[in-house]
Structures are given as structure tokens and as C-alpha cells.
């Protein structure tokens, strides 16, 4: 509905994550005015080492004012679960300046898939004067080709600064040596 109302709707999906989704599904979205791109399409027989360079981000930005980020996939089975697979996940709603960082992460990925550099100020509206809090938020991203281990460095810093406790939860616990050292 929103694309038909003139709202700019952009979608990046991971080609491997949507392996079983037929191309016609995305074509119908494009026909409805949604700008849709696959992140690093995998085509056979060109199966290379880059097949594992996937986009695992789950984020959404609305009008540059509200952002959602976390672990929830967009599919009914992740909302309702089923008898064989129940899901527990965390997703955050963010308002204020932190939304700019979520949007920046999306627009960097957008440049990667579309080669369109989106820099217009309309995408970064002024933060509402009604948002008053003392919260700090930092959005940290990673990439398999980035020389900067930002997330790992963030974990190390958090662990080293802890004074009373640290809670960590992850489905994939494959820590680097610096993270293990900091945990000890």
C-alpha cells in the first residue's frame, strides 16, 4: 500500500536467506513500486568463497525518525513459531539520533547493492524536541571484508569496563582470543 501512496520503499534481502522464495515474489514487489535488491546474489556454477559473505542485518527505518534493529526475521513463522521450532528473539525500537546510525548502515548496504549514493538531508530530519532522555545508543556493524573488527572491539571494551556483571546472549558463540581474554 505505501509504495502505491507515493512512499519510497526500499528492500534489501539476502539471496541465501531467501533461497526458497521464487523470483516472481520480488518481481511483484517491484511491479508495485518497491525498490528491491538482493544482497550478493549467488548464481551457480559461480559458487565462490564469497557465498558466505551474507547480510544478516534486520533493520527498518521509517521517515528517518523511527528505527527497528535486532534479530527478528520478517516471516510469519518467526512471529508465531510452530510446534517444532519456537523462536525467542530481541528487537529494539529506537527514536532520536540513534536512528541516523541505523539508516547509515542501511544506506551503506544500499550503495553496495544499487550503486546509488543516498545523501540528501531529507533522510536525516531534525531529532524531535519531544525526545528527552539520558540514553546513549551506538549502532555497530560488521562486514566480512572490513579491516575493522568493530563488534569484537566493542565486546572487549564492554567486558574490560564491567565492574559488577556482564550478561551476554548469542546463538553463535565463536569468540576471538581477545574476547575470551577479556571474559576471563
Where are these regions (language model features)?
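Charged, low-complexity intrinsically disordered terminal segments
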Residues: 1-184
Amino acid at each position: 500500500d505505501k509504495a502505491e501512496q507515493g512512499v519510497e520503499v526500499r528492500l534489501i534481502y539476502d539471496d541465501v536467506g531467501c533461497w526458497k522464495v521464487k523470483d516472481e515474489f520480488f518481481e511483484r514487489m517491484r511491479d508495485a513500486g518497491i525498490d528491491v535488491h538482493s544482497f550478493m546474489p549467488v548464481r551457480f556454477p559461480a559458487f565462490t568463497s564469497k557465498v558466505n559473505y551474507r547480510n544478516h542485518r534486520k533493520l527498518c527505518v521509517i521517515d528517518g525518525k523511527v528505527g527497528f534493529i535486532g534479530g527478528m526475521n520478517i516471516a510469519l513463522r518467526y512471529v508465531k513459531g510452530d510446534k517444532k521450532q519456537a523462536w525467542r528473539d530481541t528487537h529494539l525500537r529506537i527514536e532520536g539520533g540513534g536512528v541516523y546510525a541505523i539508516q547509515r548502515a542501511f544506506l551503506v548496504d544500499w550503495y553496495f547493492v544499487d550503486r546509488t549514493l543516498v545523501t540528501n538531508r531529507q533522510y536525516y530530519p531534525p531529532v524531535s524536541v519531544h525526545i528527552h532522555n539520558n540514553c546513549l545508543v551506538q549502532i555497530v556493524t560488521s562486514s566480512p571484508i572490513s579491516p575493522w573488527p568493530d563488534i569484537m572491539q566493542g565486546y572487549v571494551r564492554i567486558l574490560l569496563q564491567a565492574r559488577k556483571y556482564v550478561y551476554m546472549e548469542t546463538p553463535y558463540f565463536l569468540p576471538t582470543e581477545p574476547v575470551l581474554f577479556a571474559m576471563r
